[in-house]
Regions:
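Intrinsic disorder/low-complexity segments in short proteins, especially the signal peptide
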Residues: 8, 22-24, 33
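Hydrophobic alpha-helical context, especially transmembrane and signal-peptide helices
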Residues: 13-14, 228
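Mature extracytoplasmic or organellar-lumen-exposed domains after removal of signal/transit peptides
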Residues: 35-264
């Protein structure tokens, strides 16, 4: 097909406009990514206090035998590292929560202790972090200055923990005779996943460009909100709503893995 002279002149005039629009879009993406993650909504909108507190209690009970001796620690260290990261996310959510609770003034100290527990080089360091976490859990520490949302742990370990918790949630929340009985436990899992997603907004994968950084923020926010929706559906004992929310969580995970990063 041959273009007329008028059409050729029109195309030539439009090229600078197209390039200018592309430049504006790129500049907007760069500015938005440089500004950091968007402000988080109130924590109560995606992570109920009761779920977070119950998860803290669950982790304390689980960690106690693992940290009872050096031998037990060596056997359970790999699992402890992952669980300490999800505990960190729950504690940061409690620290920043918009509702009052027993750990409101101590969750920040516990967050730091959980982070140290996850990265402890040996049993002695793990014990020191564990003692600090327990003291704060008993209310024996002073409050730390207000923290900001930040990553829960090293990305590779956090992603493995997300995969583990997500798989457990999918299996446990299937419609059937056991749905109602396991709803509270599964709601806690969904809430912890929501907290991990919010923390992950602050940990953009290395080498991510400006446009994909914005996409990362959006995917993390969507994951947070969908897991919060899943938790609410489970608390309501609504199997259909739970299944629908989990299907969208699955789509989010696929978009994250395929579009931004590949799990090792």
């Amino acid at each position: 097909m041959r273009l007329t002279a008028q059409s050729q002149r029109l195309i030539v005039r439009q090229v600078p406009l197209v390039l200018a629009c592309a430049t504006v879009v790129a500049a907007f993406a760069n500015a938005a990514s440089a500004a950091g993650p968007p402000a988080a909504p109130p924590v109560s909108s995606f992570a109920p206090v009761g779920d977070l507190m119950a998860y803290v209690d669950e982790c304390v009970a689980t960690f106690t035998p693992v940290l009872a001796s050096a031998e037990a620690y060596d056997r359970g260290k790999a699992r402890l590292e992952k669980d300490a990261d999800s505990l960190s996310a729950a504690l940061l959510a409690l620290h920043l929560h918009d509702q009052e609770h027993r750990l409101k003034h101590h969750a920040g100290v516990m967050f730091h202790a959980a982070q140290q527990l996850a990265t402890a080089a040996d049993y002695a360091a793990a014990q020191q972090a564990w003692q600090a976490l327990q003291a704060a859990n008993r209310g024996e520490t002073s409050a730390v200055p207000q923290l900001d949302w930040q990553r829960a742990g090293e990305m590779g370990i956090v992603m493995k923990q997300v995969t583990l918790l997500h798989g457990k949630l999918k299996r446990g929340a299937r419609p059937g005779s056991r749905f109602d009985g396991a709803a509270e436990e599964n709601a806690r899992l969904a809430t912890v996943l929501a907290a991990l997603a919010q923390c992950s907004q602050s940990d953009v994968p290395p080498g991510t460009n400006a446009a994909d950084t914005i996409k990362w923020y959006d995917l993390c926010a969507e994951m947070r909100d969908l897991c919060g929706e899943t938790s609410r559906a489970l608390h309501a004992r609504d199997a259909a709503a739970t299944a629908a929310a989990l299907a969208r969580v699955e789509q989010n995970c696929t978009a994250c893995h395929d579009g931004l990063r590949k799990q090792p």
